[in-house]
């Protein structure tokens, strides 16, 4: 039994998905209904799934912009505010030594979001401005992650996530409403973000116990749900120039 307990399954699960005491509880004592350990397993599994999914979640949006050679319908201010929120979550989590499974998607979403920022500027004829923005962002990120930045500043940055998310999503919602369509917004990206933010409410409570993190994801879920609802509402709506081509 001891050899089985220390076998490949244990090496796979401990410590990535379970602490050793929970592994023993579930797979040595076979207490498969041990709720605290099941919650840890579910939270870790969801967290790692979200992180893995985040590698691809915004690529449909990137490819849609590249394919159309246009960022029509995307609010640059909204994308930038989302970048601020992702940066705040990432810096706050690194500073507080939270487990990577509780915030890792912020890193990958940040890289994809800053790519979208640049593409929006590029297709608006502001390529030089876009390059300068990338350089400035990299410099600011280095400063935020350095010992020069006090913890109070990092906490304030995380606290600013809620207004940043709300304002950013409302700007995108207003753009959609004004245009009467969702332009180059990717439905796959929007629905994946909505599902991910919902799951993150549970994982942030379970893995960090931080009310600031959990509150951010509650607000993010509500705002992402608004954009998802607009996508469904405007599903068959097209920009005016595409309507003319269809006619």
Swiss-Prot record:
Species the sequence originates in = Homo sapiens (Human)
Q: Which family does it belong to?
A: Belongs to the MPDU1 (TC 2.A.43.3) family.
Q: Does the keyword Acetylation apply?
A: yes
Point out residues bearing the modification N-acetylalanine.
Answer: 2
Q: Which InterPro entries match?
A: MannP-dilichol_defect-1, PQ-loop_rpt
What are the TM regions of this chain, as residue ranges?
A: 37-57, 74-94, 100-120, 128-145, 151-171, 185-205, 213-233
Residue ranges of every copy of the PQ-loop domain listed in the record: 39-105, 159-216
Give the UniProt record's GO annotations in the biological process aspect: dolichol-linked oligosaccharide biosynthetic process; oligosaccharide biosynthetic process; protein folding
Gene coding for it: MPDU1
Q: Where in the cell is it found?
A: Membrane
**Any Pfam family matching the protein:** PQ-loop
What membrane topology is annotated for this entry?
Answer: Multi-pass membrane protein
Pathological condition linked to this protein in its record: Congenital disorder of glycosylation 1F: A form of congenital disorder of glycosylation, a multisystem disorder caused by a defect in glycoprotein biosynthesis and characterized by under-glycosylated serum glycoproteins. Congenital disorders of glycosylation result in a wide variety of clinical features, such as defects in the nervous system development, psychomotor retardation, dysmorphic features, hypotonia, coagulation disorders, and immunodeficiency.
* Function as written in the Swiss-Prot or TrEMBL entry: Required for normal utilization of mannose-dolichol phosphate (Dol-P-Man) in the synthesis of N-linked and O-linked oligosaccharides and GPI anchors.
Q: Which UniProt keywords apply?
A: Acetylation, Congenital disorder of glycosylation, Disease variant, Membrane, Repeat, Transmembrane, Transmembrane helix, Transport
GO cellular component terms, alphabetically, are: endoplasmic reticulum membrane; membrane
**The protein, known as:** Mannose-P-dolichol utilization defect 1 protein
């Amino acid at each position: 039994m001891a050899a089985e307990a220390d076998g490949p399954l244990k090496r796979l699960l401990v410590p990535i998905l379970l602490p050793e005491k929970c592994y023993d509880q579930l797979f040595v004592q076979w207490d498969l209904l041990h709720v605290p350990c099941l919650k840890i397993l579910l939270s870790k599994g969801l967290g790692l799934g979200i992180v893995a999914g985040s590698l691809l979640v915004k690529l449909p949006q990137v490819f849609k912009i590249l394919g159309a050679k246009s960022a029509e319908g995307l609010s640059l201010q909204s994308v930038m505010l989302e970048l601020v929120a992702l940066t705040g979550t990432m810096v706050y989590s690194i500073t507080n030594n939270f487990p990577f499974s509780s915030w890792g998607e912020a890193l990958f979403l940040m890289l994809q979001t800053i790519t979208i920022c640049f593409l929006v500027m590029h297709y608006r004829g502001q390529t030089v401005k876009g390059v300068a923005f990338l350089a400035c962002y990299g410099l600011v990120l280095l400063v935020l992650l350095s010992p020069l930045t006090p913890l109070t500043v990092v906490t304030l940055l995380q606290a600013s996530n809620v207004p940043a998310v709300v304002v950013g999503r409302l700007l995108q919602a207003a753009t959609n409403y004004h245009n009467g369509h969702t332009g180059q917004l990717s439905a796959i990206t929007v629905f994946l973000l909505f599902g991910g933010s919902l799951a993150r409410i549970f994982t942030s409570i379970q893995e960090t116990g931080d009310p600031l993190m959990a509150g951010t994801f509650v607000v993010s879920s509500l705002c992402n749900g608004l954009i998802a609802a607009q996508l469904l509402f405007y599903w068959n709506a097209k920009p005016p120039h595409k309507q003319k081509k269809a006619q």
